[in-house]
Each structure stands twice: as C-alpha cells, then as structure tokens.
Amino acid sequence: MITKEQKAQIVAKYGANKKDTGNIFVQIAILTAEIEDLKPHFLANPKDNHSRRGFIAKITKRRILLQHLKKENFELYNKVLAELNLRK
C-alpha cells in the first residue's frame, strides 16, 4: 500500500496542481505505483487468492483507463507509457 506522502508526490509530479487527483495521467500513475508495491507480496505468497482479486481489479482499472486515454489522446497515451515504463 502506498502512503499518503507517496500519493501526494505522484499527484504533484503528474498533475496540473497538488489537488489534481482526477487527471487520468495521475490516476494511471497512482494505480501503477500500487501495482508495483503489491508485486512482491504475490511473489512471496502465491496462494493468496483473496488479495489477488483486488490486485487484478487494479490492473483491470488501469487497463481500462489506458484504453480510454488511447482513444481520446494518443500523444498523452504514448507519454504515459514512456514515463511509467509500461509496455503495450
């Protein structure tokens, strides 16, 4: 789980201002940070299927946001992929 401070840093880095949490770039960046934070847990606990459900939900939400961004603003989509080191 990422802390409030980490989330605030992400919002400050990718948002227009420090309260711009609705920006799609910020939402994708926060979900990516949460996903990266949970990966070691599933490597250590491969049978934790209850938590895996929430993990997959985060991945799905990020994928849906990326699909929407690709349809609406392809240049920003490519920027998001490059800055967050995501592959598509």
From Swiss-Prot:
- Gene Ontology MF terms in the entry: rRNA binding; structural constituent of ribosome
GO annotation terms (biological process) = translation
Q: Name one Pfam family in it.
A: Ribosomal_S15
Keyword terms: Ribonucleoprotein, Ribosomal protein, RNA-binding, rRNA-binding
Q: Which InterPro entries match?
A: Ribosomal_uS15, Ribosomal_uS15_bac-type, uS15_NS1_RNA-bd_sf
Q: Name one GO cellular component term.
A: cytosolic small ribosomal subunit
Tell me the domain of life.
Bacteria
Question: Of which family is this protein a member?
Answer: Belongs to the universal ribosomal protein uS15 family.
Which PANTHER family does the record associate with it? RIBOSOMAL PROTEIN S15, BACTERIAL AND ORGANELLAR, SMALL RIBOSOMAL SUBUNIT PROTEIN US15M
Complex formation? Part of the 30S ribosomal subunit. Forms a bridge to the 50S subunit in the 70S ribosome, contacting the 23S rRNA.
Protein name (record): Small ribosomal subunit protein uS15
Lineage start: Bacteria, Bacillati, Mycoplasmatota, Mycoplasmoidales, Metamycoplasmataceae
Query: Encoded by which gene?
Result: rpsO
